[in-house]
Amino acid sequence: MEKIPVLVAGALGKMGSEVIKAIYKSNDCELVAAIDNANEMEGVDIGTALGMDQMDVAVTADLEGSLCVASQSVRNSSGNAVLIDFTHPNVVYEHSRASIAYGVHPVIGTTGLSIVQLEELREFANKASIGAAIIPNFSVGMVLLQQAAAAAASFYDYAELTESHHNQKADAPSGTCIKTAEIIEEIGKSFNKTTIKEQESIKGSRGGLRESGLRLHSVRLPGIVAQQQVLFGSPGETYLLSHNTIDRSAYMPGVLHTIRKVRHLKSLVYGLEKIL
């Protein structure tokens, strides 16, 4: 069976290293590039760097060179390579554009893209007829929470969202929290209407306010991987939806599923629910 060639950007990071371990254990994926800007690890076998068996793939900071090699090596194969990106909001947009330009399918797990950047990538991928996926959260459990939140939105007029992550996460609120809010807002109504004029003694105490009236709150602490809560309220009751990621291995089934699916797409999709 021909294996899917996969490049991982952010290979030495928390998520990138988990992805490489999942690829190593899979039967149908093959790591062809481990991209990271950790200069001290340049040229080191990624397997050795992660405390695994050697994988004959050296750590490199050269994204475009890796994309070029991958695009050339698969021209005579049955499908294009896939780039998995878990890097930083400052670089993920350029990484994605470069990947599409080389005919390599980008799967973006890095959050922090602006709405304008997302739409530009959608247009770029669609024009190139290259499948691409922007996935704020690869957890199937999170997809189920979002579906439950969308259903509850019909019955509750008050709702607030809280997301908690480790203190190394650069963007806030998280892409998952924003995506959840967008799914709730698809019902097309306003939330949290009040006749009271609120006054914050400390700016930001009430969280970020969206046009729909939904409020989003962010927590950053060591010891947390990822948590999200959606709290609905009405007179006499509250309804709490909660999801807690204990270990990053929970994301790997979703990552591998996306790798397999994205090569059959001709446009960009946003959200794991679009390809389940």
From Swiss-Prot:
So what does this thing catalyse? Answer: (S)-2,3,4,5-tetrahydrodipicolinate + NAD(+) + H2O = (2S,4S)-4-hydroxy-2,3,4,5-tetrahydrodipicolinate + NADH + H(+); (S)-2,3,4,5-tetrahydrodipicolinate + NADP(+) + H2O = (2S,4S)-4-hydroxy-2,3,4,5-tetrahydrodipicolinate + NADPH + H(+)
| Family label | Belongs to the DapB family.
Q: Which UniProt keywords apply?
A: Amino-acid biosynthesis, Cytoplasm, Diaminopimelate biosynthesis, Lysine biosynthesis, NAD, NADP, Oxidoreductase
Binding positions for NAD(+) per the UniProt entry: 10-15, 36, 109-111
**Known pathway:** Amino-acid biosynthesis; L-lysine biosynthesis via DAP pathway; (S)-tetrahydrodipicolinate from L-aspartate: step 4/4
Q: Identify this protein by name.
A: 4-hydroxy-tetrahydrodipicolinate reductase
Identify the species of origin. Answer: Prochlorococcus marinus (strain SARG / CCMP1375 / SS120)
Q: Which domain of life is it from?
A: Bacteria
- Mention any Pfam family matching this sequence: DapB_N
